Amino acid sequence: VVDLVNDERADVGCAAVTVDSRLARAAQRHSDDMAEREYLSHTSPDGTTFDERIRDEGHPRPAAENIAMGLSSPEAVMDAWMSSDGHRRNILNCDITTIGVGVNSDGWYWTQNFGY
């Protein structure tokens, strides 16, 4: 997914994002939580937001989050995100510098977390 993100960013003149382990942990934990509790939302059932999840992992500057479910390949999820104005805007935001991706294959829950 990260390579696909960077391909899209290169096409519009944005610098590549780099993987940040804190964003990756937050993304994986959110994908796992969504799969376990069977929901799809940027806010968990207990009210925790993506910004709070990222900061809880120690990342100081959360930027955005993309989520999806039901798509079983990186190409399929990226196609879906790039077909959505809001998700595409996050991916192609040239101010974003870091990324973390999580996926849970039980229902194919995906999370992309972005940071500055």
Give residue ranges: language-model regions.
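Disulfide-stabilized extracellular recognition modules
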Residues: M69-Y116
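Short glycine-/small-residue-rich flexible loop motifs, especially phosphate/cofactor-binding loops
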Residues: N6, D51, R88
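A local structural micro-motif
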Residues: A16-T18, H42, P62, I99
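A short alpha-helix/helix-coil micro-patch that ends at or immediately precedes a cysteine
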Residues: V1-A35
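Short, surface-exposed glycine/acidic/tryptophan-bearing loops
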Residues: A24-P74, I91
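Broad hydrophobic/π-residue packing in well-ordered secondary structure
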Residues: R9, H30, Y39-L40, P60-R61, ...
